Amino acid sequence: MTSNHLPHHNLTDEDQQEYNKIFKEFIFNIPHNMNPFSPQLDEKKNSHIVEYHWRSPSNTIPSTCNTLYVCFNSPIPVNVIPNNVIILCFLCENKTGFTKGPDFNHPIHPGTIPMSVRYIYFINATYNKPLIAHALPPSAEYLFLSDCYNQAFRAGDLPPNLNILETGDEYNQPFDPLVIPKSLRSLFLGKGYNQPLEFGGLTSLTCLVYDEGSISELPIISLPPNLEFLLLSDAFNHPIEAGMLPPKLKTLTFGDGFNQPLAVGTLPPSLENINFGKVFDQPFLPNVLPHHLKSISFHQFSYFSQTFENIPSHVQTVEFGYTYNKPITSLPSHLKYIKFSEKYNHPIDGVLPQSLTHCYLGKSFKRPLVPGIFPPGLKVLILNGYPKKIPPGTVPANCNFQKNPKQGACSVM
């Protein structure tokens, strides 16, 4: 999954790294335990990896192999893959990146994949064979299906302990709650998924993500009651009604096409992070944003041009889009991190709260900076293209300050 909502992470000082860590948690990044790419990275980081590129079923796989790449298009015999393999990937990987071998496209029978396998990747482009009941072992926690895969799931097809399921771009089948394992926590849908948003029966799901560029235009019918993380389709542009969003939702990301007014009571009190897509341009009326909201971000190329007001005091992180240039007269009292737009050029005297620790001002900002304008606890200050001399004492003593940083290293986000 990729998104223009992702912030940039370029600075390397200790405070900046800590900021990036917090910002990723607040803004867009999928929570670590819901991320489809974090489990295997941890596996590689925390254990000794022995990779093997299996180029023919007649070749013997080393018994020490724990990461196996299937690089052929022939049936896989039963009981051949050793019971030490943890990561099974139907794609050939070399040290310089991924290179495709022959696309595997054969049925997988029970007993083919050993009980040790936890992560299964059909990254090859053509795989589209129906899954066979109980062929994927109960040890499997993560399943990534190829872009061509478009087979409906039947009872027993998916492992009973599956935590994360990611479908490819051509998958467009409804999800039957009776055949989806109760262990499933995270579901990632490809660009082509265009079934009704009727997921209320998937009660174990806590993370639901539509891929960037998704074509799904359908309204929400029901969402999982325990959902905490929701990223809607870029084509979604329907009103959000009261009670539509789950009561435990913490992070909500609207796609690029969403531009509906938000009414009081439509966003659940549990919401901590909200991210708006490209075309969103609606005012924030009083009491619309939940009291305990922690972060607000706008798309990099956001159209948002409304007055930035009625923001809850507990908000700690704000990121504006590239062109936002409305005067800001007040900011939340608990704010720690702010990224003004590249076009912002209004006075900030008396605007920045004492809680602020990280501040980015874009290349259009040319207002005078004087002692006392920045709070004394500021840790990171970036002025991208500031043309004027800065009087002594303006930048707090312990602040990591960069003026006119090099291209690509100018964002605190």
From Swiss-Prot:
SUPFAM superfamilies given in the database record: L domain-like (SSF52058)
Key words of the record: Calmodulin-binding, Repeat
FNIP repeat copies, ranges: 104-148, 149-192, 222-257, 258-301, 304-343, 344-386
Pfam families given in the database record: FNIP
Record GO terms (molecular function): calmodulin binding
Assembly information from the UniProt record: Interacts with calmodulin in the presence of Ca(2+).
Name by which UniProt lists this protein: Calmodulin-binding protein CmbB
